[in-house]
């Protein structure tokens, strides 16, 4: 991740496993990282778009093991880093070590456990380190300086900056607060910083990268396309078009930053 990247998020199993694999391959061309969400029945950090995608996947009988199978298939064709996103409950129920080893065997590069606070993650971090599994933690605009440093140090892949307060979902534009947060994180953090929540356009990506982000994380905008077009060639075309627009925005933002 030397140049800024697009981190593309999909919910695995939405609308089915075969479609997810096709969508991952479609996004791969323009993505530096793919974030694969494991469907969960109570996704508290996610907005209506991703909650609905979780429901679609789970109503089709989707299981965690299927996420690992999808990733194994993807690994036959691509070395693009994949981060698995989940909540703590499914990891705990499976056994932390068991989950981490299965994710590693499937080809995951890192994990995001959205609702696991850093102060409660000691055992999880030890297990991830033991199995050479990357970790990503989240920070919000109101995260104090010391906590921001700790989250940065605990995040081996990148620190996930939440652009604004609330849940995931597309929005029109970003407030100055978001840009100030990126600048603050840039000064404080030694590792990579990627910004998520609300990014859906090339112009969004451009402005966030220009301010100093190493990547933008886009989820709801891709999931909306899948909701509209389902398992179809049209969905693949639309996903590729949006990924290209976002990628171009990232390139423009990087150029502006380096002028």
Curated annotation (Swiss-Prot):
One of its GO terms (cellular component) is cytosol. InterPro entries: Aldolase_TIM, RibuloseP-bd_barrel, Trp_synthase_alpha_AS, Trp_synthase_suA. GO terms for molecular function: tryptophan synthase activity. Its EC number is 4.2.1.20. Transmembrane segments: none annotated. It catalyses: (1S,2R)-1-C-(indol-3-yl)glycerol 3-phosphate + L-serine = D-glyceraldehyde 3-phosphate + L-tryptophan + H2O. It holds the Pfam family Trp_syntA. The active site is at 35 (proton acceptor), 46 (proton acceptor). Keywords: Amino-acid biosynthesis, Aromatic amino acid biosynthesis, Lyase, Tryptophan biosynthesis. Pathway: Amino-acid biosynthesis; L-tryptophan biosynthesis; L-tryptophan from chorismate: step 5/5. It comes from the Archaea. It is an enzyme of class 4 (lyase). Tetramer of two alpha and two beta chains. Belongs to the TrpA family. PANTHER family: TRYPTOPHAN SYNTHASE ALPHA CHAIN, CHLOROPLASTIC, TRYPTOPHAN SYNTHASE, ALPHA CHAIN. The alpha subunit is responsible for the aldol cleavage of indoleglycerol phosphate to indole and glyceraldehyde 3-phosphate. This is Tryptophan synthase alpha chain. It comes from Methanococcus vannielii (strain ATCC 35089 / DSM 1224 / JCM 13029 / OCM 148 / SB). The lineage of its organism: Archaea, Methanobacteriati, Methanobacteriota, Methanomada group, Methanococci. The gene is trpA.
